[in-house]
């Protein structure tokens, strides 16, 4: 409901009071669930990060590091877009609202660190090392490009398939950086 209001009136054009009134809840309930107005936008992405971390943690040991990343990004994103009718639309709001972009780097940094952490565990390095962070940044670049390149009316399947196709060559090239087989 809040996302629909924000899509119609713009993020800055919708107050917390308007959201709680439309939802029929109190301000206390709103803040208990979301913490802040930007939390309405970001909570689903934060859940996706947790899912991504779990998928990377549970990846088969014989799978290449970057192949595990590609599969985990696609799988966690697929779950997210099917768990919410407006998951993808949140990113339209992020791109169109300067006040939301202010906090975006914090959330994207968590997304990148999930990937960099997996890559570091795979090679015995640190998640803050340049190579894992650069590889995670490349994956983020693909992800953001696909979010921004999404056509209106694109179905969820089309988005997830395009994300997978776009990640494949990038993760394929980066895989050689994380091979441990000599």
Task: Identify the role of each PLM range.
Residues 3, 12-13, 21-24, 33-70, ...:
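An amphipathic alpha-helix adjacent to DNA-recognition modules
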Residues 17, 28:
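Residues within helix-turn-helix
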Residues 48, 73, 107-111, 115, ...:
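Hydrophobic/aromatic residues within well-ordered alpha-helical segments
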Residues 82, 97, 109-136:
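Hydrophobic alpha-helical bundle segments that form small-molecule/ligand-binding pockets
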Residues 87:
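Residues that scaffold, gate, or flank divalent-cation-dependent active/transport sites
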Residues 104:
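Small/polar (Gly/Ser/Thr/Ala-rich) solvent-exposed segments
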Residues 117, 155-182:
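C-terminal peripheral helix-coil segments that are non-catalytic and often amphipathic
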Residues 122-168:
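Hydrophobic/aromatic-rich alpha-helical bundle segments in the mid-to-C-terminal region
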